[in-house]
Protein backbone atom coordinates (compact mmCIF):
# COMPACT_ATOMS: atom_id res chain seq x y z
CA UNK A 1 0.00 0.00 0.00
CA UNK A 2 1.35 3.43 -0.87
CA UNK A 3 2.13 5.89 1.91
CA UNK A 4 -0.52 8.44 2.84
CA UNK A 5 1.08 11.75 3.69
CA UNK A 6 0.17 13.73 6.80
CA UNK A 7 -2.20 16.59 5.85
CA UNK A 8 -1.47 18.38 9.12
CA UNK A 9 1.77 19.78 7.72
CA UNK A 10 3.01 21.57 4.61
CA UNK A 11 5.27 19.56 2.30
CA UNK A 12 8.07 21.49 0.61
CA UNK A 13 9.08 19.48 -2.45
CA UNK A 14 12.11 20.00 -4.68
CA UNK A 15 10.88 19.84 -8.28
CA UNK A 16 14.29 18.99 -9.73
CA UNK A 17 16.18 20.86 -12.46
CA UNK A 18 13.63 20.61 -15.27
CA UNK A 19 13.17 17.13 -16.67
CA UNK A 20 9.84 15.99 -15.22
CA UNK A 21 11.26 12.54 -14.50
CA UNK A 22 13.99 13.92 -12.24
CA UNK A 23 11.66 14.58 -9.32
CA UNK A 24 12.20 12.13 -6.45
CA UNK A 25 9.86 9.19 -5.99
CA UNK A 26 8.60 10.69 -2.73
CA UNK A 27 8.00 14.03 -4.41
CA UNK A 28 6.09 12.27 -7.18
CA UNK A 29 3.90 10.43 -4.67
CA UNK A 30 3.17 13.67 -2.85
CA UNK A 31 2.03 15.32 -6.06
CA UNK A 32 -0.23 12.34 -6.73
CA UNK A 33 -1.95 12.95 -3.39
CA UNK A 34 -1.79 16.74 -3.36
CA UNK A 35 -5.02 18.65 -2.84
CA UNK A 36 -3.37 22.07 -2.80
CA UNK A 37 -0.23 22.79 -4.86
CA UNK A 38 1.60 26.11 -4.69
CA UNK A 39 4.26 26.06 -7.37
CA UNK A 40 6.97 28.39 -8.69
CA UNK A 41 5.50 28.78 -12.17
CA UNK A 42 8.31 30.93 -13.52
CA UNK A 43 10.91 28.28 -12.67
CA UNK A 44 9.56 24.73 -12.57
CA UNK A 45 8.50 22.50 -15.43
CA UNK A 46 4.72 22.83 -15.18
CA UNK A 47 4.35 19.37 -16.74
CA UNK A 48 4.96 18.16 -13.18
CA UNK A 49 1.45 19.33 -12.36
CA UNK A 50 0.16 16.53 -14.58
CA UNK A 51 1.06 14.18 -11.71
CA UNK A 52 -1.52 15.92 -9.50
CA UNK A 53 -5.17 14.91 -9.21
CA UNK A 54 -7.39 16.81 -11.64
CA UNK A 55 -9.33 18.38 -8.77
CA UNK A 56 -6.24 19.69 -6.94
CA UNK A 57 -6.17 23.42 -6.28
CA UNK A 58 -3.20 25.01 -8.09
CA UNK A 59 -1.62 28.38 -7.35
CA UNK A 60 1.30 30.00 -9.15
CA UNK A 61 3.50 31.66 -6.53
CA UNK A 62 5.12 33.89 -9.17
CA UNK A 63 2.05 36.10 -8.80
CA UNK A 64 2.03 36.10 -4.99
CA UNK A 65 3.95 37.69 -2.13
CA UNK A 66 5.06 35.81 0.99
CA UNK A 67 2.00 36.55 3.12
CA UNK A 68 -0.35 35.36 0.38
CA UNK A 69 1.62 32.13 -0.02
CA UNK A 70 1.49 31.48 3.73
CA UNK A 71 -2.25 32.18 3.82
CA UNK A 72 -2.87 29.61 1.08
CA UNK A 73 -0.79 27.02 2.93
CA UNK A 74 -2.50 27.72 6.25
CA UNK A 75 -5.98 27.58 4.74
CA UNK A 76 -5.21 24.24 3.10
CA UNK A 77 -3.92 22.68 6.31
CA UNK A 78 -6.87 24.06 8.28
CA UNK A 79 -9.22 22.40 5.78
CA UNK A 80 -7.42 19.07 6.28
CA UNK A 81 -5.96 19.04 2.78
CA UNK A 82 -2.55 17.74 1.68
CA UNK A 83 -0.56 20.88 0.83
CA UNK A 84 2.52 20.78 -1.40
CA UNK A 85 4.84 23.74 -1.93
CA UNK A 86 6.63 22.82 -5.18
CA UNK A 87 9.90 24.68 -5.72
CA UNK A 88 12.62 24.51 -8.33
CA UNK A 89 15.65 22.25 -7.95
CA UNK A 90 16.32 21.57 -4.28
CA UNK A 91 14.67 23.88 -1.77
CA UNK A 92 17.87 24.29 0.26
CA UNK A 93 19.51 26.36 -2.50
CA UNK A 94 18.06 29.84 -3.04
CA UNK A 95 14.67 28.46 -2.07
CA UNK A 96 13.54 30.87 0.70
CA UNK A 97 12.43 27.84 2.68
CA UNK A 98 13.53 29.25 6.02
CA UNK A 99 11.32 32.33 5.89
CA UNK A 100 8.33 30.29 4.76
CA UNK A 101 8.99 27.65 7.40
CA UNK A 102 9.34 30.19 10.20
CA UNK A 103 6.03 31.79 9.26
CA UNK A 104 4.34 28.40 9.32
CA UNK A 105 5.93 27.52 12.66
CA UNK A 106 4.76 30.85 14.09
CA UNK A 107 1.22 29.81 13.16
CA UNK A 108 1.65 26.39 14.75
CA UNK A 109 1.82 24.55 11.43
CA UNK A 110 4.36 21.76 10.95
CA UNK A 111 6.33 21.47 7.73
CA UNK A 112 8.66 18.95 6.13
CA UNK A 113 11.11 19.06 3.23
CA UNK A 114 11.51 16.54 0.43
CA UNK A 115 14.87 17.22 -1.27
CA UNK A 116 15.25 17.55 -5.01
CA UNK A 117 17.91 17.38 -7.71
CA UNK A 118 19.51 20.81 -8.02
CA UNK A 119 20.42 22.45 -11.33
CA UNK A 120 24.16 22.11 -10.68
CA UNK A 121 23.70 18.33 -10.56
CA UNK A 122 21.51 18.26 -13.65
CA UNK A 123 24.04 20.41 -15.51
CA UNK A 124 26.93 18.09 -14.64
CA UNK A 125 24.91 15.09 -15.79
CA UNK A 126 24.03 16.79 -19.05
CA UNK A 127 27.66 17.70 -19.74
CA UNK A 128 29.02 14.35 -18.54
CA UNK A 129 31.45 15.99 -16.12
CA UNK A 130 32.35 15.67 -12.46
CA UNK A 131 33.22 18.60 -10.22
CA UNK A 132 35.76 16.69 -8.15
CA UNK A 133 38.44 15.53 -10.58
CA UNK A 134 41.41 13.80 -8.89
CA UNK A 135 44.45 16.13 -8.63
CA UNK A 136 42.51 18.91 -10.41
CA UNK A 137 39.74 19.92 -8.02
CA UNK A 138 38.34 18.35 -4.88
CA UNK A 139 35.99 21.17 -3.88
CA UNK A 140 32.91 22.86 -5.30
CA UNK A 141 31.81 26.41 -4.54
CA UNK A 142 28.14 27.27 -5.10
CA UNK A 143 27.47 30.99 -5.17
CA UNK A 144 25.88 33.93 -6.99
CA UNK A 145 26.43 37.59 -7.79
CA UNK A 146 24.77 40.03 -5.46
CA UNK A 147 21.40 41.33 -6.61
CA UNK A 148 18.42 42.44 -4.59
CA UNK A 149 19.77 39.97 -2.04
CA UNK A 150 23.27 41.13 -1.03
CA UNK A 151 26.24 38.77 -0.74
CA UNK A 152 28.42 38.97 2.40
CA UNK A 153 31.74 40.77 1.83
CA UNK A 154 33.72 37.64 2.65
CA UNK A 155 31.85 35.76 -0.11
CA UNK A 156 32.62 38.01 -3.07
CA UNK A 157 33.58 36.28 -6.32
CA UNK A 158 37.14 37.58 -6.10
CA UNK A 159 37.63 35.83 -2.75
CA UNK A 160 36.33 32.52 -4.05
CA UNK A 161 38.32 32.82 -7.28
CA UNK A 162 41.57 32.77 -5.32
CA UNK A 163 41.00 29.04 -4.71
CA UNK A 164 40.75 28.30 -8.46
CA UNK A 165 38.49 25.35 -7.71
CA UNK A 166 35.22 24.24 -9.33
CA UNK A 167 32.42 26.79 -9.19
CA UNK A 168 28.69 26.76 -9.96
CA UNK A 169 27.29 30.29 -10.16
CA UNK A 170 23.54 30.77 -9.98
CA UNK A 171 21.30 33.73 -10.83
CA UNK A 172 24.05 35.70 -12.55
CA UNK A 173 24.07 35.00 -16.29
CA UNK A 174 22.52 38.37 -17.11
CA UNK A 175 25.78 39.93 -15.84
CA UNK A 176 28.22 37.33 -17.09
CA UNK A 177 30.65 39.98 -18.35
CA UNK A 178 30.99 41.22 -14.77
CA UNK A 179 31.27 37.66 -13.46
CA UNK A 180 34.18 36.91 -15.79
CA UNK A 181 35.94 40.18 -14.94
CA UNK A 182 35.73 39.56 -11.23
CA UNK A 183 36.83 35.94 -11.43
CA UNK A 184 39.91 36.94 -13.42
CA UNK A 185 40.60 39.76 -10.96
CA UNK A 186 40.40 37.23 -8.13
CA UNK A 187 42.95 34.83 -9.58
CA UNK A 188 41.45 32.59 -12.25
CA UNK A 189 43.50 32.66 -15.47
CA UNK A 190 41.60 34.13 -18.41
CA UNK A 191 42.01 30.75 -20.12
CA UNK A 192 39.96 28.95 -17.44
CA UNK A 193 37.20 26.83 -19.05
CA UNK A 194 33.58 27.94 -18.62
CA UNK A 195 30.27 26.33 -19.52
CA UNK A 196 26.94 28.13 -19.42
CA UNK A 197 23.93 25.81 -19.39
CA UNK A 198 20.53 27.26 -20.17
CA UNK A 199 17.65 25.29 -18.60
CA UNK A 200 19.70 22.19 -17.78
CA UNK A 201 17.82 18.91 -18.45
CA UNK A 202 14.90 20.67 -20.15
CA UNK A 203 14.11 19.69 -23.78
CA UNK A 204 15.19 23.17 -24.90
CA UNK A 205 18.46 23.08 -22.94
CA UNK A 206 21.42 24.84 -24.54
CA UNK A 207 25.11 24.83 -23.63
CA UNK A 208 27.70 27.47 -24.48
CA UNK A 209 31.37 26.68 -23.82
CA UNK A 210 34.33 29.01 -23.75
CA UNK A 211 36.85 30.57 -21.41
CA UNK A 212 36.66 33.47 -19.01
CA UNK A 213 38.14 35.59 -21.79
CA UNK A 214 35.40 34.97 -24.35
CA UNK A 215 32.36 33.46 -22.62
CA UNK A 216 30.56 36.79 -22.27
CA UNK A 217 30.50 37.40 -26.02
CA UNK A 218 29.46 33.81 -26.73
CA UNK A 219 26.58 33.94 -24.27
CA UNK A 220 25.42 37.27 -25.69
CA UNK A 221 25.52 35.86 -29.22
CA UNK A 222 23.48 32.85 -28.05
CA UNK A 223 20.83 35.15 -26.61
CA UNK A 224 20.95 33.62 -23.13
CA UNK A 225 19.81 36.12 -20.51
CA UNK A 226 18.21 34.10 -17.71
CA UNK A 227 17.55 30.61 -16.32
CA UNK A 228 21.15 29.56 -16.84
CA UNK A 229 23.93 28.21 -14.65
CA UNK A 230 27.57 29.27 -15.01
CA UNK A 231 30.15 26.53 -14.39
CA UNK A 232 33.79 27.55 -14.02
CA UNK A 233 36.98 25.60 -13.44
CA UNK A 234 39.56 23.22 -14.77
CA UNK A 235 37.24 20.27 -14.14
CA UNK A 236 35.83 21.29 -17.54
CA UNK A 237 39.25 20.99 -19.17
CA UNK A 238 41.24 18.10 -20.56
CA UNK A 239 43.43 17.37 -17.54
CA UNK A 240 42.39 14.23 -15.72
CA UNK A 241 43.86 11.70 -13.31
CA UNK A 242 42.46 8.33 -12.31
CA UNK A 243 41.13 7.91 -8.79
CA UNK A 244 43.30 5.78 -6.51
CA UNK A 245 40.16 4.09 -5.18
CA UNK A 246 39.98 1.67 -8.11
CA UNK A 247 43.71 1.24 -8.69
CA UNK A 248 44.77 -2.43 -8.72
CA UNK A 249 47.54 -1.77 -6.17
CA UNK A 250 45.27 0.08 -3.73
CA UNK A 251 43.93 -1.84 -0.72
CA UNK A 252 40.93 -0.89 1.39
CA UNK A 253 38.37 -2.49 3.69
CA UNK A 254 36.55 -4.29 0.88
CA UNK A 255 39.41 -5.22 -1.43
CA UNK A 256 43.03 -6.28 -1.08
CA UNK A 257 45.67 -5.31 -3.63
UniProtKB/Swiss-Prot annotation:
It catalyses: Co-precorrin-4 + S-adenosyl-L-methionine = Co-precorrin-5A + S-adenosyl-L-homocysteine + H(+). The keyword Transferase applies. SUPFAM superfamilies: Tetrapyrrole methylase. Gene3D superfamilies: Cobalt-precorrin-4 Transmethylase, Domain 1, Methyltransferase, Cobalt-precorrin-4 Transmethylase, Domain 2. Its EC number is 2.1.1.271. Keywords: Cobalamin biosynthesis, Methyltransferase, S-adenosyl-L-methionine, Transferase. PROSITE patterns: SUMT_1, SUMT_2. One of its GO terms (molecular function) is precorrin-4 C11-methyltransferase activity. GO terms for biological process: cobalamin biosynthetic process; methylation. Pathway: Cofactor biosynthesis; adenosylcobalamin biosynthesis; cob(II)yrinate a,c-diamide from sirohydrochlorin (anaerobic route): step 4/10. Pfam families: TP_methylase (PF00590). Belongs to the precorrin methyltransferase family. This is Cobalt-precorrin-4 C(11)-methyltransferase. It comes from Salmonella typhimurium (strain LT2 / SGSC1412 / ATCC 700720). The gene is cbiF.
Amino acid sequence: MSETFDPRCVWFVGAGPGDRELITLKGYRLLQQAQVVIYAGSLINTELLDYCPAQAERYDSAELHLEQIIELMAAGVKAGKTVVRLQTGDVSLYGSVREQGEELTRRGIDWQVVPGVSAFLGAAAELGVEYTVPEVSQSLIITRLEGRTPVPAREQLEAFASHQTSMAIYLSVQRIHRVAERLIAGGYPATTPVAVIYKATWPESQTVRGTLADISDKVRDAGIRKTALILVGNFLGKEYHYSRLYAADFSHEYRKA
